[in-house]
Regions:
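Periplasmic/extracellular electron-transfer cofactor-ligation site
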Residues: 26-68, 74, 78-79, 90-99, ...
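Alpha-helix N-capping/helix-start residues
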Residues: 28, 82, 108-109
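Bacterial N-terminal signal peptides that target proteins for export
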Residues: 1-10
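Pocket-edge positions in alpha/beta enzyme catalytic cores
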Residues: 23, 77, 104-107
């Protein structure tokens, strides 16, 4: 009996450990829909009220030539990686106190992941016009 309980416990723990692997992959198509919120101020290929997102991944924050960033963003020393974008998109004002980006953030981790997948695909400098 004790062996059966032990075996059942091992199987239960193995199943729980594997459940994390079932997390859904980021979806660039869904991210395009999330980006519609950003499009009020941003565009992929050109500056608007906010800077363009073409070539965003790997770019230093506050570095698009000709765009007037806040001092906080220019001096942030952030290089836009997936992790840096995730932190910023969750709460821009917490990530860069003094940023001029007047957006509260995206609380949903899955929406942020989708948006980042879209930005990586659409913002690839080889594809930007």
């Amino acid at each position: 009996m004790r062996a059966k309980v032990l075996a059942a416990s091992v199987l239960l723990l193995a199943g729980a450990a594997g459940a994390g692997n079932l997390a859904r992959a980021a979806d660039a198509k869904a991210g395009e829909a999330v980006y519609e919120r950003c499009a009020a101020c941003h565009a992929i290929g050109h500056d608007r009220a906010g800077p363009r997102h073409c070539g965003l991944i790997g770019r230093r924050a506050g570095s698009v030539p000709g765009f007037e960033y806040s001092e906080a963003m220019r001096s942030s020393k952030i290089v836009w990686s997936e992790a840096a974008l995730d932190r910023f998109l969750a709460n821009p004002m917490k990530a860069v106190p003094g940023t001029s980006m007047g957006y509260a953030g995206i609380p949903s981790a899955s929406e942020r992941a989708d948006l980042i997948a879209y930005l990586k695909a659409a913002g690839d400098p080889r594809r930007c016009r």
